């Protein structure tokens, strides 16, 4: 009743995530021993395969089991619970506070001795001046705005790092919790990106034996495009889960294994479509389509969320189709082009000249399979975090006829496509550069020279260094053909491990968006 009265039950379901609430009572035992229980809880939240059977129902304390991903965790505290958060959680070891995407307190004092251990978006109502100061300091706020009774202090270089401050004279904590979520927290998420030793496997009951969370010490703060009642908040895209057990059943995987489950076929996908496409008000052939392929073990909707593709699509107004392909990656080259054709036939506003493809890890493999089988239907490709293991001879014959702009997206701790020890793409990553240079009429190099050309190892035509979200250095190289068109690219983000990151959506689309393939001739057209 208490949770329902605050409105948190509805928020939990709306968020498709986790809300941790510290209660206002003083006699619940807040202190160091309670903090240890918080560590155990956080370990469970970030643990895979953590569930118990209760009355025949599977109950999942783990974020990944509940919503298919990580990082939608928000902390709320009132009264004594807020004081516990301020004095124990905020300054805890291992940056416990850095695992949550939003931190709300209603009341609650804070000791002068506490130092907030990492930046965290905070919403403080009836808080002390000490708490406001310390959270502003942790977030590096240097700018200010005021509206509707709420003061917002934010970091002008990284605006996601902010502190909202308000005073409530009506004693309505629930109203402010809902405000904090809807105005701030639901647009934020954490992603597990930097690999060191962080979350050690737990060996204590009741979590003994679960697959441990990845060894992570830093959770990046990133923007998010939440889905509420089947629509994205940014861009008002309709997100629809599709199941069709017949349409593609004639193409079945064979051989067994993770990517080729015997007899499996494409029957499940998500469609993410702008409203003007759904209601037929968009002009014919005016909206691009992105085929987006998830990684191994990923939920296909959370993949769109945690790579930032949902947010990029909302901002840019393109459509997305995301197939579930666990067990059928081996037949992606046959089945997924038919899924693209189905989308183009179903929605006349989608542009057949601007069909793009991307995918992460196993989804990168699906991307290679698609562009090897049917390069003619795609205007550009951006495989992520996956080496190239060769292409069939049939693909070589197709590439004699069709060019295909291709960018490999990876990171410096990506075990799949990057050689961390030597600081450049691994053999499979280099094969992407060599193969798609050759296919696009660019002479491959005889030997890579990483002394002369650090990281990329070969001549290039343009280079860009940027910083994403104020903390992640990003390197991008483009290689042009004899017409001056950039046809091959390499994009590398520093320090990220092999995991989903919300910056990838923008990186991929910023490359893909420049290309279209003429329907009549198959020619690639590039626009700045």
Predicted stretch roles:
Residues 124-126, 408-410:
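Short beta-strand/loop motif that positions the catalytic acidic residue
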Residues 1-47, 148-163, 289, 293-346, ...:
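Active-site machinery of serine-nucleophile hydrolases
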Residues 3-6, 15-18, 26, 32-43, ...:
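A domain-start/cap signature at the N-terminus of enzymes
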Residues 109-121, 387-404:
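Flexible "cap/lid" loop of the alpha/beta hydrolase fold
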Residues 116-122, 158-161, 400-406, 484-488:
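Short, proline-enriched alpha-helix->beta-strand connector loops that line the catalytic pocket
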Residues 128-130, 413-418, 497-500:
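Acidic catalytic loop of the alpha/beta-hydrolase fold
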Residues 38-71, 335-353:
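Conserved acidic catalytic loop of the alpha/beta-hydrolase fold
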Residues 130-143, 424-469:
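Acidic, glycine-rich loop-and-strand cores that form catalytic or ligand-binding grooves
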């Amino acid at each position: 009743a208490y949770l329902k009265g605050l409105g948190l039950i509805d928020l939990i379901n709306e968020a498709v995530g986790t809300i941790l609430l510290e209660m206002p009572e003083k006699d619940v035992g807040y202190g160091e021993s309670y903090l240890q229980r918080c560590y155990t809880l956080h370990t469970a939240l970030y643990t895979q395969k953590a569930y118990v059977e209760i009355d025949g129902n599977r109950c999942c304390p783990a974020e990944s089991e509940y919503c298919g991903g990580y990082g939608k965790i928000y902390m709320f505290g009132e009264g004594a619970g807020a004081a516990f958060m301020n004095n124990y959680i905020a300054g805890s070891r291992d940056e416990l506070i850095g695992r949550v995407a939003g931190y709300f307190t209603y009341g609650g004092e804070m000791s002068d001795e506490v130092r907030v251990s990492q930046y965290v978006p905070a919403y403080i109502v009836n808080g002390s001046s000490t708490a406001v100061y310390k959270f502003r300091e942790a977030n590096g706020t240097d700018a200010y705005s005021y509206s509707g009774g709420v003061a917002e202090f934010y970091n002008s270089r990284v605006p996601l790092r902010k502190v909202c401050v308000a005073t409530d004279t009506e004693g309505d904590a629930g109203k402010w919790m809902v405000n904090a979520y809807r105005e701030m927290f639901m647009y934020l998420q954490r992603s597990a990106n930097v690999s060191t030793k962080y979350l050690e496997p737990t060996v204590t009951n009741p979590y003994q034996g679960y697959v441990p969370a990845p060894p992570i010490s830093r959770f990046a703060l990133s923007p998010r495009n939440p889905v509420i009642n089947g629509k994205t908040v940014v861009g008002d895209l309709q997100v629809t889960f599709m199941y069709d057990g017949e349409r593609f059943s004639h193409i079945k995987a064979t051989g067994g294994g993770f990517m080729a489950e015997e007899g499996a076929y494409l029957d499940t996908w998500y469609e993410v479509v702008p409203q003007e496409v759904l209601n037929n008000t968009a002009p014919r052939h005016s909206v691009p389509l992105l085929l987006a392929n998830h990684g191994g073990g990923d939920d296909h909707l959370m993949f769109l969320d945690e790579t930032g593709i949902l947010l990029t699509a909302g901002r840019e107004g393109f459509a997305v189709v995301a197939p579930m392909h666990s067990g059928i990656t081996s037949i992606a080259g046959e089945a997924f082009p038919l899924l693209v054709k189905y989308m183009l036939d179903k929605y006349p506003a989608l542009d057949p000249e601007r069909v793009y493809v991307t995918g992460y890890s196993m989804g990168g493999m699906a991307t290679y399979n698609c562009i090897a089988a049917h390069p003619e239907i795609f205007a550009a490709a951006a495989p992520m975090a996956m080496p190239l293991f060769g292409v069939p001879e049939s693909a070589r014959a197709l590439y004699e006829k069709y060019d295909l702009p291709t960018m490999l997206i990876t990171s410096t701790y990506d075990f799949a496509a990057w050689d961390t020890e030597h600081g450049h793409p691994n053999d499979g990553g280099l094969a992407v550069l060599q193969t798609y240079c050759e296919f696009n009429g660019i002479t491959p190099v005889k030997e890579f020279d990483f002394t002369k050309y650090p990281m990329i190892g070969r001549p290039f035509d343009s280079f860009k260094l940027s910083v994403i979200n104020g903390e992640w250095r990003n390197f991008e190289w483009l290689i042009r053909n004899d017409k001056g068109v950039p046809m091959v690219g390499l994009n590398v983000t520093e320090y990220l491990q092999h995991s989903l990151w919300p910056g990838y959506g923008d990186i991929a689309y910023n490359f893909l968006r420049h290309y279209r393939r003429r329907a009549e001739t198959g020619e690639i057209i590039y626009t700045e």
